[in-house]
Amino acid sequence: MEQSLNIRYIYHSSFSLEFEDKIIIFDYFQGTLPKNVNDKKVIFVVTHSHADHYNESIFDYENASDITYIVSEDVYEEIFDYDTKDNVVFLGEDNIEDLKKHFGKKVIKLEVGESTSVYGADFTALGSTDMGISVYFEANHLKFFFAGDLNNWVWEEDTEEEKEKMQQDFSKEIDKIGHVDIGFFPVDPRLKERYDLGVNEFVDKCNPKVLFPMHFTKDPTIVDTFIDTHDYEGCKVVNMKKEHDTFQVIIK
């Protein structure tokens, strides 16, 4: 029986993957979250605590009755940072409400190498060349990879040694992924002419059938440039750069 998957662009590196039975939302920090979820279950995934990938307002999301949060270790520690609290603070009214809010949620900490299954989707945390994790996951017979801040971050001012180290670290992580059907990967214009080093290697080694460029913030023209200058065999690059842009996948 055919199923549909709607992938909707929210902002920067945030997407919602809207299956018939669940919605998976990655790295939300601003924009409009899904409102009409009906009886679908919702999974928020947060790869790290950078301000352009995480907003604690996700814990105030009330449009679904069944919500699970999968977060990296640094985000988890930020949520449950009790080492910095003393007994007086714990007894404060605001902090009690904060504890109630977070303990009432299903929050799963996912460290590199760990896996978890939620609502029929299987998630595995892989490494990053920046902060936090990247995520490989399988859902509804499809294989996905969401890079988070995993990229070949080679900057103009880097030394040759730094560039070589970054290349080695990046390739080491990419080699762990394997084939995927759908990938989400940075094309950051701040890297200038090196912006496609990471995504080129990802496509070459992981052979995604569909690729979603991300991490371009206020410069969406990089997506047009990327599509105009790259023609990957067997891989469709999706041009989604405005909020609510949607791409539909039919699952057979």
Task: Go through each PLM region and give its residues.
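Active-site environment of divalent metal-dependent phosphoester hydrolases
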Residues: G31-P34, H50-Y54, Y76-I79, E114-S117, ...
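Active-site metal-binding motif and surrounding structural segment of the metallo-beta-lactamase
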Residues: Q30-E78, K172-F184
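Binuclear metal-ion centers of metallo-dependent hydrolases, dominated by the metallo-beta-lactamase
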Residues: R8-H12, N87-V118, D196-K252
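Core dinuclear metal-dependent hydrolase active-site scaffold
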Residues: M1-D39, E97-H179, E243-K252
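Short amphipathic alpha-helical segments
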Residues: V37-D39, E56-F59, D81-T84, D158-T159, ...
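Short active-site oxyanion
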Residues: S4-L5, I23, S65-Y69, K209-V210
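A short, acidic, amphipathic alpha-helical segment used as a generic capping/interface helix at domain edges
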Residues: Q168-E173, K192-E201
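Structural motif
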Residues: I25, V45, I70, F144-A147, ...
